[in-house]
From Swiss-Prot:
Binding-site positions, [4Fe-4S] cluster 2: C74, C104, C107, C110
UniProt enzyme class: translocase
Alphabetic keyword roster: 4Fe-4S, Chloroplast, Iron, Iron-sulfur, Membrane, Metal-binding, NAD, NADP, Plastid, Plastoquinone, Quinone, Repeat, Thylakoid, Translocase
Name by which UniProt lists this protein: NAD(P)H-quinone oxidoreductase subunit I, chloroplastic
InterPro entries: 4Fe4S_Fe-S-bd, 4Fe4S_Fe_S_CS, NADH_quinone_OxRdtase_chainI, NDHI
Cofactor stoichiometry and binding remark: Binds 2 [4Fe-4S] clusters per subunit.
Domain 4Fe-4S ferredoxin-type per the UniProt entry, residue ranges: 55-84, 95-124
Quaternary structure (record): NDH is composed of at least 16 different subunits, 5 of which are encoded in the nucleus.
Cell location: Plastid, Chloroplast thylakoid membrane
The protein's role, per its UniProt record: NDH shuttles electrons from NAD(P)H:plastoquinone, via FMN and iron-sulfur (Fe-S) centers, to quinones in the photosynthetic chain and possibly in a chloroplast respiratory chain. The immediate electron acceptor for the enzyme in this species is believed to be plastoquinone. Couples the redox reaction to proton translocation, and thus conserves the redox energy in a proton gradient.
Species name: Physcomitrium patens (Spreading-leaved earth moss)
Gene: ndhI
Protein family membership: Belongs to the complex I 23 kDa subunit family.
GO biological process: photosynthesis, light reaction
Pfam family, one: Fer4_7
Length: 181
């Protein structure tokens, strides 16, 4: 009879402990119900990239002096710089410039070390495409500035996320459609 009482006591303790664990899990669930949703309806709502976001590279053809520093500092020697030497002025003249974004690792070395600042990083991150060969941008495609997410009136921007700094939010305060959850 003593073993039966001991077994019942152990069973009761285990049942109480299981109820505590279920209660703890339920409290976590209730805690998460009070939080704001983190889901972003992507095509219609977009995040504002941070100030130091490294997106697609923008190239200014007129500023480039064809020094090829960008090619030397690139870990994968990606930028293709085609130039010819003008013998009358003894200077290089840029003929073409291209970057394949299907291979680019967006490290930003080319932008950082460019002596004439003809390269810059944009906030464009939508580079998805069906054919990878279309990601090879020449100087004309690199020269196009992307439509800013903030200036596009058809898209709501999400700016009250915790990882954004106050400066980046205040810098974009003139946007028309800001979703506050």
């Amino acid at each position: 009879m003593f073993t039966m009482v001991n077994g019942f006591r152990n069973y009761s303790e285990q049942a109480i402990q299981a109820a505590r664990y279920i209660g703890q899990g339920f409290m976590v669930t209730l805690d998460h119900m009070n939080r704001l949703p983190m889901t972003i309806q992507y095509p219609y709502e977009k995040l504002i990239p941070s100030e130091r976001f490294r997106g697609r590279i923008h190239f200014e053809f007129d500023k480039c002096i064809a020094c090829e520093v960008c090619v030397r500092v690139c870990p994968i020697n990606l930028p293709v710089v085609d130039w010819e030497l003008k013998k009358d002025v003894k200077k290089k003249q840029l003929k073409s410039y291209s970057i394949d974004f299907g291979v680019c690792i967006f490290c930003g070395n080319c932008v950082e070390y460019c002596p004439t600042n003809c390269l810059s990083m944009t906030e464009e991150y939508e580079l998805s495409i069906y054919d990878r060969h279309d990601l090879n941008y020449d100087q004309i495609a690199l020269g196009r500035l992307p439509i800013s997410v903030i200036e596009d009136s058809t898209i709501k921007t999400i700016s009250n996320l915790s990882y954004l700094s106050k400066g980046s939010i205040e810098g974009h305060s003139n946007s028309r459609n800001v979703t506050n959850f």
